């Protein structure tokens, strides 16, 4: 291509509309990065080779070093070539920038051509002939300038493109052993394990569609004697889940269904001990009436109904089906609907007991105290009830003298208050 034959519009247009130095700059950066990596790899190989010829010196290390040394030399030479390639790319960039600066900008060329058209259009009497000639001379200078810039750019680019050809890496393997390696690979592929592995994958591919097809078919179309494998697997899964739900350490295993009625029955019996325990505590402990901050307890005891009849055994336990009692709209056991007798006044009951009876009551009346203790929260609906022995009643004659000595002492008592629940 002869740049002198091209007008400045073409040469300048090519320089200004091209991609610029960006692609060449990216190439130079890539060559520099490749050179750095090759140098680092070659240095690592050289370090390993020095170790082979040092503490690990021997026939094997010598063979390995002799095989790897040519490859290390090739990497070092290639790294140098990559550095040269990056430098040459930067030379090309410099050549482009110089040619771009020497090229006439396209707007200047366009203005010259527009001025020429105006001068020619107004040159009626030839008065614009000198100006036309001057304009043409400027255009020719632009032509020559662009041609010279393009010639210089071509020469600089040719110099920058001169590079030493890269060589292929040396062969570091023994060609004579490649045949033996291929035979060993073929023998391994022909073994039973290799054959099983190769046949298992096609079987898997064919088994999956068959299983899906079996799931898609109706159950009646299958043979009654032949059970599909996936059905057997589902049966095993159900067996496993059944053992997990009904095993010996699950809730049904620890508490079988036969124990549930027992729990319900014992709850019905224990619930009858509620109100009587409050009566035993408020009516049988202490030697003086309740006064002061605890005075409201006497009023509370007067209005707290206690169900049951006299005696330690309490009400009889009955069982039946379909004959539950009703408290409002709530179904309850039959014993819960027995009328609650009036509780005696704690003030009168406390007069019969002395503080001196408390030590003996700790041993004699412990059973009565615990027997009347409330074992549920239904204080107002406790079953017809058990009456505990008065605490200290059996020991009163033995400690009468001591009781007289301490009659005036302040009475101390631990009182457990269980509020009555609304019906």
Swiss-Prot record:
GO biological process annotation, one example: response to host immune response
Encoding gene (name): PPE29
Any one GO cellular component localisation term in the record: peptidoglycan-based cell wall
Entry-linked Gene3D superfamilies: PPE superfamily
Gene induction: Highly up-regulated during the early stages of invasion of the human blood-brain barrier.
Function statement: Could be required for host endothelial-cell invasion and/or intracellular survival.
Disruption phenotype: Invasion of the infant human brain microvascular endothelial-cell monolayer is significantly decreased in transposon mutant.
Source organism of the structure: Mycobacterium tuberculosis (strain ATCC 25618 / H37Rv)
Cystine bridges: none
Identification of the protein by name: Uncharacterized PPE family protein PPE29
Family membership noted in the UniProt record: Belongs to the mycobacterial PPE family.
PANTHER family on file: GLUTAMINE-RICH PROTEIN 2
